[in-house]
């Protein structure tokens, strides 16, 4: 089974982050500065042996590759940041492209949202997200295709796989993806596979899904929406529509503004880990093209502080049990051979398989044991 873990590349210094958050800023700054918000809340999370790594260091990428293979992760889905010709955090993947020693399959998720200071509570938009026209789409394609042609890039039936974080914010979605399909065939591929990661897009039948091949049931976001779907439904939809208009018109991403009040109103600021997994393991696939997902844990208080959301009750033992059941469902209910995992290294949002001081290699061992138990270890 192809177990693909989402991977955040913000573990190295870049000039834009230095300018807005201070010299030397990386995701580790938020992780180190995290504070417990209530009794029993474990923060800060500390990497095992204080391994606050630099992702530009080759030894780090080799270590991550070896760890993933040892414990059964098939590949990484790296977040890719492209703003109408400008890029952020691109260097680690460019280094991987040039280094065959890092022999782990990978793919991209285009994190197509504005680069902003929203996690600080400010509405400052540093780099808005616009999409341009065919000229800009071709420029983006020309960058991506170098990776698509790499033997390590994850394909489905020979077609390179590209995940899109938020298709609903792309006004020219159908035209752009249709154009990229043409370019893929011109390059000699049998096509290209587009996957959606957004729960809002997946659950909104008013959107044009015609160019999306598969929908990832991204967790725990889908379970969160499922468990809270009947509370303030009309108000939530109105808010989504207004914010979607602002994003398409001005390139702003203000979705998270007001999230704190909404979570408080719907009692979802401290959700139960077990209830979330119960929903995941009993929910029917949204459609025949749904791809299942697992989540390790969720705690984004390192970024959002008191406005954050903290799931209660996660342990490696529970995760092993739930993950094993999700492997079975992937085969028997979804009829797929691929599952995404939140996440390899989302330390700022509490979703990481990498070892820490509290659980050591517990979550990685849970993955390995569950895969072996189900006869699905990929290596």
Sequence positions of predicted segments:
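N-terminal regions that are enriched for targeting/export leaders
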Residues: 1-63, 69
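Aromatic-lined glycan-binding groove of carbohydrate-active enzymes
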Residues: 3-7, 15, 172-313
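Conserved, mostly hydrophobic/aromatic
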Residues: 5, 68, 158, 292, ...
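Acidic-and-aromatic substrate-binding clefts and catalytic sites of carbohydrate-active enzymes
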Residues: 11-13, 52-59, 79-91, 170-172, ...
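Aromatic-rich peripheral "rim/lid" segments of glycoside hydrolase catalytic domains that contact
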Residues: 26, 36, 96, 342-345, ...
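Aromatic-lined substrate-binding rim segments of carbohydrate-active enzymes
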Residues: 59-108, 290-292
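Active-site groove signature of glycoside hydrolases
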Residues: 77, 112-114, 120-124, 141-170, ...
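Substrate-binding cleft of secreted/luminal carbohydrate-active enzymes
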Residues: 314-355, 377
């Amino acid at each position: 089974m192809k177990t693909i873990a989402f991977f955040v590349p913000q573990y190295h210094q870049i000039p834009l982050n230095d300018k807005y958050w201070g010299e030397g800023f990386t995701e580790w700054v938020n992780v180190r500065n995290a504070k417990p918000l209530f009794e029993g809340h474990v923060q800060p999370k500390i990497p095992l042996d204080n391994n606050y790594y630099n992702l530009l260091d080759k030894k780090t990428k080799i270590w991550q590759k070896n760890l993933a293979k040892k414990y059964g992760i098939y590949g990484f889905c790296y977040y890719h940041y492209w703003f109408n010709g400008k890029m952020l955090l691109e260097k680690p993947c460019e280094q991987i492209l040039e280094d065959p020693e890092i022999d782990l399959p990978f793919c991209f998720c285009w994190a197509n949202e504005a680069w902003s200071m929203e996690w600080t509570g400010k509405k400052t938009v540093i780099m808005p997200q616009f999409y341009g026209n065919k000229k800009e789409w071709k420029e983006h394609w020309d960058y991506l295709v170098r990776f698509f042609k790499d033997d390590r890039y994850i394909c489905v039936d020979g077609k390179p796989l590209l995940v899109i974080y938020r298709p609903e914010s792309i006004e020219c979605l159908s035209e752009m993806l249709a154009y990229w399909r043409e370019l893929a065939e011109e390059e000699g591929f049998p096509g290209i596979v587009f996957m959606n990661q957004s729960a809002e897009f997946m659950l909104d039948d008013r959107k044009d899904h015609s160019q999306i091949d598969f929908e990832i049931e991204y967790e725990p976001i889908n379970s969160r929406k499922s468990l809270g779907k009947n509370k303030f439904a009309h108000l939530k939809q109105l808010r989504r529509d207004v914010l979607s208009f602002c994003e398409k018109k001005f390139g702003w991403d203000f979705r998270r503004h007001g999230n704190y009040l909404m979570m408080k109103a719907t009692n979802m600021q401290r959700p139960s880990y077990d209830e979330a997994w119960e929903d995941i393991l009993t929910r029917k696939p949204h459609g025949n093209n749904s791809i299942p997902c697992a989540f390790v844990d969720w705690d984004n208080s390192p970024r959002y502080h008191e406005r954050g959301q903290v799931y209660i009750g996660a342990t490696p033992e529970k995760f092993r049990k739930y993950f094993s059941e999700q492997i079975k469902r992937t085969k028997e209910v979804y009829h797929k051979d691929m599952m995404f995992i939140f996440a390899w290294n989302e330390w700022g949002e509490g979703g990481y398989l990498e070892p820490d001081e509290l659980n050591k290699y517990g979550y990685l061992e849970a993955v390995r044991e569950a895969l072996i138990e189900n006869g699905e270890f990929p290596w």
